[in-house]
Amino acid sequence: MKYIDLNADIGESYGNFKVGEDEAILPLVSSINVACGFHAGDFMVMAECCKLAREYGVNLGAHPGYPDLWGFGRRSIPYTKEEITNMLLYQLGALSAFARAEGVKITHVKPHGALYNDAVVKVEVAEAVARAVWVFDAEIAIVTLPYGRLFEIASEMGLTVIREGFADRGYLPDGRLVPRNQEGAKKTGDEAVAQAIALAEGWVKAVDGTVIKAEVDTICVHGDNIEAVKLAQKINRELLNKNIYVQAWRKKRA
């Protein structure tokens, strides 16, 4: 029997600004990554997401980013290693308080946007992210691409690393994601569903047609995608057709 974790980035609304359909996607995924107030999210949204994690029994992850509401955390900002570590600790502490109030725990950390991409290629950023998780709680896992600096450094430190693939993003031949400002960056509809199935089976096709080996533990559907709920529904259905079951990576598997 084969299993795959399906995760969604949620909690990215704040104030009167609404992003995504958080509760609607919860029955369709096994893990969530909650924005922690720096790139998106606020204290009311974070509290609600922790409540939903408890109600739906999904893995609760922190989704910290650069302090960049204006750019939605998708702009790389030069910070020192100490600053990056501390900004992550700040965000982890905030989400942890809401999680504790709901009787749940943070199971993983997935950096957001530019911080995620920087940690893949920049040693200093990867070290800062890994250190933040290590000093906060070394039992918490890190979610990242199945290669790159963060994967290597976190693994060397003995942290649990969850290898991630993306249903709705294009891939470069080297396994990195196509930058959002380039052609082929996004996958939609049936193309995204097909890519999710391929990832669950251990491979993905790059924008140039190259077939890449991709052993992943979890597949992401971006919650801010307007078709996220429909996409997650279709992915669930097609995975079942392949006898692949959606289940949180933390749970014991037969």
From Swiss-Prot:
Keyword Metal-binding on entry: no
Pfam families: LamB_YcsF
Keyword set, alphabetical order: ATP-binding, Hydrolase, Nucleotide-binding
CDD domains hit by this protein: LamB_YcsF_like
Entry EC no(s): 3.5.2.9
Superkingdom of origin organism: Bacteria
Entry's Gene Ontology BP terms: carbohydrate metabolic process
Signal sequence range: none
Entry keyword Nucleotide-binding: yes
Reactions mediated catalytically: 5-oxo-L-proline + ATP + 2 H2O = L-glutamate + ADP + phosphate + H(+)
GO MF annotation: an example: 5-oxoprolinase (ATP-hydrolyzing) activity
InterPro entries in alphabetical order: Glyco_hydro/deAcase_b/a-brl (IPR011330), LamB/YcsF/PxpA-like (IPR005501)
NCBIfam families: PRK05406.1-3, PRK05406.1-5
Known function: Catalyzes the cleavage of 5-oxoproline to form L-glutamate coupled to the hydrolysis of ATP to ADP and inorganic phosphate.
Assembly, per entry: Forms a complex composed of PxpA, PxpB and PxpC.
PANTHER family: 5-OXOPROLINASE SUBUNIT A, UNCHARACTERIZED PROTEIN YBGL-RELATED
Family: Belongs to the LamB/PxpA family.
Protein name, per record: 5-oxoprolinase subunit A
Source species of the chain: Carboxydothermus hydrogenoformans (strain ATCC BAA-161 / DSM 6008 / Z-2901)
